[in-house]
UniProtKB/Swiss-Prot annotation:
GO terms for molecular function: inositol-3-phosphate synthase activity. The keyword Phosphoprotein does not apply. It is found in: Cytoplasm. Belongs to the myo-inositol 1-phosphate synthase family. This is Inositol-3-phosphate synthase. It comes from the Eukaryota.
């Protein structure tokens, strides 16, 4: 069996490696100093033997619209206490789709950084790093230096105790039986000189057999499907995956595991009353092997029942209502959907900029082509539809936030005399084509057609070329790091209440995801700035700190 799948493998274990000279590693791969970089000196923050206890006041405002249309605003305050366990322990990362472009790049990046393997390129020597990771390669404003008045920034990874990506024990499943060295060669993502050095570390690593239901992915994937859990009994498959997780955890002496889907995009599952609308019905549907229970939902259920976080990195509706309810019942953690790596991230930023500038986007047209297996799978219409849905909703909340530019559903109903459920919205189309010659290099072309002053028009065209897996891989590390962290955070609403885990749906992961999963009934936030601010503010709240204040009164008033 695979050393990273079921058997502990010391030569892949960073805990047993000699300590690296931190001056010789890339800043994004450096370790936090022993005992942590930050210590908050405040009555609101207490450092205990096993964690950090912090008091935080959530300040907001309630707004009531009167019959005359005027708004009544009242300030609100709600007091919380957060407790973050400081011991990270040994963490496993199990990838569904381990042998794909993303999976092989995750393992290769982990090993290259763990062993500090550098390689030759045409531009010179390249050092391993975690560039592209929000957690490892970006900073947050902590405060100001009282002597100089200058802002002080720290890496997000130093805010709270977090697992270092070098320390993940990586394993997982794939419908393809190729060993990881051959899968890496097939992916054609990394430079040959790096691959050459990684082959000895990856040649004995093979993915565990996975689940294959041909109706859920494109028919063109059948030639890869030679590593399958036998049979078509979905209850047996569920128990098989649960056993894999338990065995992986036990054999690698892990304290926790995160499971993440980075496999093929599936078609959407139909939501059927009595089948997948409740937790109990979903469990019964698995027992009867109902055709609308997808592989990704089986993996999500297995993770939930084993009490480990599950993140969906693809756009399909893995989290049918019954799956969310199952997570709620078991107080397990889930997050999704669909990695937000390139074009969509730019789109959410640019659309927000235009709307906040008082400019009205009338249409957004997005064209993509790529040559990797993701593009091949998406060449099938049913799988493309899943991606189209996730990419098309990314500007909804920004449009809804500006009723000056866009008529609301209520306004349209009054104007037409008909019941309108959705307000005015830019025309938005998405096209994705498979072009094998370009490989993992994804080309994206966006046109933004907007209304200006006095009926004027503006056209913006953006051409974006990127390595798909080299953008997605850092997000996978971010999602796993943050999901593990959030399992160690509990809260209570007053000093005498019971400590509780966070709500099951980890919407704090939204920054990394195209179609963020949120608590049922709550509005989705797609604004990249708001998503980033929410993550920063939560990390600060766990330290008892207020969120960043950009008012800078000392420079503007006195």
């Amino acid at each position: 069996m695979s050393p990273t799948a079921l058997d502990a493998c010391d030569h892949h274990d960073s805990f047993s490696l000699p300590a690296q000279d931190q001056s010789k590693v890339h800043p994004s791969a450096r370790r936090t100093p022993e005992g942590g970089l930050i210590k908050v000196e405040s009555d609101s923050t207490v450092y205990e033997a096993d964690g950090i206890k912090a008091k935080f006041t959530d300040r907001g405002a309630s707004v009531i619209k009167g019959s005359d249309g005027k708004l009544s605003v009242k300030k609100t305050e709600k007091n919380f206490e957060f407790f973050t366990k400081s011991t990270v322990g040994r963490v496993g990362l199990m990838l569904v789709g381990l042998g794909g472009n993303n999976g092989t790049t995750v393992l290769a990046t982990n090993l290259a950084n763990k062993y500090n393997i550098s390689w030759h390129t045409k531009n010179g020597i390249q050092q391993p790093n975690y560039i592209g990771s929000v957690v490892r390669a970006s900073t947050v404003r902590l405060g100001t230096d009282p002597e100089t008045g200058k802002d002080v920034f720290v890496p997000i990874s130093d805010m709270l105790p977090m697992v270092h990506p070098n320390d993940f024990v990586i394993g997982g499943w794939d419908i393809s039986s190729l060993s990881m060295d051959k899968a890496m060669l097939r992916a054609k993502v990394l430079e040959w000189d790096l691959q050459r050095q990684l082959i000895p570390l990856m040649e004995n690593v093979k993915p565990l057999p996975s689940i294959y239901y041909p109706d859920f992915i494109a028919a063109n994937q059948a030639d890869r499907a030679d590593n399958l859990i036998p049979g078509d009994d979905k209850k047996v498959h569920l128990e098989h995956i649960r056993a894999d997780i338990r065995r992986f955890k036990a054999d690698n002496h892990l304290d926790s595991v995160v499971v993440l889907w980075t496999a093929n995009t599936e078609r959407y599952a139909d939501i059927i009353p009595g089948v997948n609308d409740t937790a109990d019905n979903l469990l019964k549907a698995v027992e009867t092997s109902h055709e609308e229970v997808s592989p990704s939902t089986i993996f999500a259920m297995a993770s939930i029942l084993e009490g480990v976080p599950f993140i969906n990195g693809s756009p399909q509706n893995t989290f049918v209502p019954g799956c969310i309810e199952l997570a709620e019942k078991h107080k397990a953690f889930i997050g999704g959907d669909d990695f937000k790596s390139g074009q969509t991230k730019v789109k959410s930023v640019l659309a927000e900029f235009l709307v906040n500038a008082g400019i009205k986007p009338l249409s957004i047209s997005s064209y993509n082509h790529l040559g990797n297996n993701d593009g091949k799978n998406l060449s099938s219409q049913r799988q493309f539809r899943s991606k189209e849905i996730s990419k098309s909703s990314v500007v909804d909340d920004m449009v809804a936030a500006n009723p000056i530019l866009y008529k609301t559903a209520e306004d349209l109903s009054k104007a037409t005399g008909e019941i309108v459920k959705k307000g005015e919205h830019p025309d938005h189309i998405v096209v994705i084509k498979h072009v094998p010659a370009v490989g993992d290099s994804k080309r994206a072309i966006d046109e933004y057609y907007s209304e200006l002053l006095m009926g004027g028009r503006n056209v913006m065209n953006i051409f974006n070329e990127c390595e798909d897996s080299l953008l997605a891989t850092p997000l996978i590390f971010d999602l796993a790091i943050l999901a593990e962290l959030l399992t160690r955070v509990t809260y209570r609403e007053n000093a005498t209440g019971e400590w509780q885990p966070l709500y099951s749906v980890l919407s704090l992961l939204s920054y990394m995801l195209k179609a963020p999963l949120v608590k049922p009934g709550e509005d989705v936030v797609n604004s990249l700035n708001r998503q980033r601010n929410a993550l920063e503010q939560f990390l600060k709240a766990c330290l008892g700190l207020e969120h960043s204040n950009d008012l800078l009164l000392n420079t503007r008033v006195w």
